Structure formats: C-alpha cells, structure tokens
C-alpha cells in the first residue's frame, strides 16, 4: 500500500502595532533608522499600547506577482523589498476580498516606507516594519496592507481589517507585519 502525500503551503500572518508617546519624533527617528523595538523600550520606555492582529487575506494581485517573481516570468516589477515596500493604513472597515487592489479608504489612508534594514527574514518568517511619526496617519486605523509602491498603484500583497484605535499627533505608531510559511 502506498502512502498518500499531500502538498500544502500554509501562511500565518501576524500584525503588531506598537503605540508610543512621541511629541518630538525621537522614537520614530530611532526606529526608522533601524533601532530594534527592544532598544527603543530601553531608551524611551514602554509603548503605551501594543496591539496584535492575527490573519489577513492575500490579494489576487499580490499572489499573482509573487508567483511570477518566483518563476522568473516577471523580472521588472518592484518587489516588496526595502527599496519599494510600504506598509499602508486606512480608515475603511470594508470587508476583505481577494479581488481588492489595496486599501479601501476614500481619503484617510497613508503609506510609510520601510524602517532601515526591513524587511527581514528569520527562518521561514518575513517581517516588514514601518514607523508612522507624530504627523503621519492621524486617523482611525481600521485596515492594513503591504504594497510595492507608495500608493495603491502598486501591487498589494494582502489586506486586513481590524479597529485598533485612532492615532493622534504626538504619537508614533510602529506597524509590523510577519508572514510565516510552513
């Protein structure tokens, strides 16, 4: 009797938001220059909030580009690298759908370039990180994405909705996306 072998690829997604009081953008500058969260805590104290969001939906446009990059079919498009990846946030709570092409907010959405040295890979986990300073994205955070451009004109890999509060001036919020493949 032969053994049945199943092929599968599982992706586990974890979003984290670190919320800092940061009137002078000292924390945001430190993190944007590549300082670790642990170093920021030692230097500036604990964040006033830490949020975790599990899961998301992969968007068709991101899946298709990732497959083309893996196969060498597309060698010219921007990847989700330090040079071209942005984490985006918006205030829309429209349900996720694989056919969406980015954030759904009409006006309140913002994209932030990667903090220095991100994305990073450890074993089977990729991690993107961007820090939104005191004057960035001051609205309700309801939706999240990683995109390979500074707007939804790029290819969005995924989208997640989850209400995590309203960011205000004088605060810096660090958004982290981890995707683990197994």
State what each model feature region is.
Residues 1-141, 148-182:
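Small cysteine-rich, disulfide-bonded extracellular modules of the LU/uPAR three-finger superfamily
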């Amino acid at each position: 009797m032969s053994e049945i072998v199943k092929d599968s690829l599982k992706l586990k997604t974890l979003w984290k938001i670190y919320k800092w009081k940061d009137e002078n953008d000292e924390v945001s500058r430190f993190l944007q220059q590549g300082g670790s969260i642990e170093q920021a805590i030692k230097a500036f104290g604990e964040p006033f909030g830490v949020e975790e969001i599990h899961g998301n939906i992969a968007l068709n446009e991101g899946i298709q580009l990732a497959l083309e990059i893996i196969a060498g079919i597309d060698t010219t498009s921007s990847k989700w690298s330090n040079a071209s990846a942005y984490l985006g946030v918006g205030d829309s709570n429209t349900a996720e759908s694989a056919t969406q092409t980015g954030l759904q907010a009409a006006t309140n959405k913002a994209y932030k370039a990667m903090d220095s040295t991100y994305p990073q890979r450890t074993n089977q986990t990729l991690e993107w990180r961007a820090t939104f300073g005191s004057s960035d994205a001051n609205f309700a955070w309801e939706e999240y994405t990683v995109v390979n451009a500074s707007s939804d004109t790029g290819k969005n890999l995924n989208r997640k909705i989850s209400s995590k509060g309203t960011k205000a001036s004088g605060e810096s919020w660090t958004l982290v996306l981890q995707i683990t493949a197994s």
